[in-house]
C-alpha cells in the first residue's frame, strides 16, 4: 500500500498535470477582474441599469480598490517587487509604499463619486507613471519580471495585465475630469 501526501502528489499519482513550482499564472488577476465585474453589475442592477456607463466606472473603481487591498496585505513585499520596474519608485522609494494607499483612495472615492478633485489627479499620476514604467520594462527593455499588481507574492507576469490596470486608472481619471 503506497502512502500519498499532499494535493500535488495525489495529482501526480493519478497522472494529472501538476503546476510547476514558480510557474506564472494570470489566475489572480482574472479573479480580481471577475469579482469586480460582478460587483459592478450587482450595483448597476440595484441602481436600475445593468449595462451603463456607471457600471463600467464602478468596474474600474472596484478593480482598483481590490488590487490595492491585495498590495496592502504585504506592503513590504509589494514595494520590493514594484521597485524592479516603476520609474518613480526607483527615484523615490517612499512612493512604492504610498502607491497602494493612493490606488485605494482613488478607487474608493470613485466608487462613492466623492472628492473627485483628489481621486482624479491621484489616478492620473499613478496610472500614467505606472503605464510608462511597465511599457519601458516590458516592451523597450524586454525584461521578464513578475507583476506587483496583485501584491508582492504573486507569479503574475508583468506585461499586458499591469499595463491594462494602469491604462484603466489613466482612462478613469481622464473620463472623470
Where are these regions (language model features)?
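Extended, hydrophilic extramembrane loops/domains of integral membrane proteins
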Residues: 2-17
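Membrane-interfacial helix-loop segments of redox and metal-homeostasis proteins
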Residues: 19-177
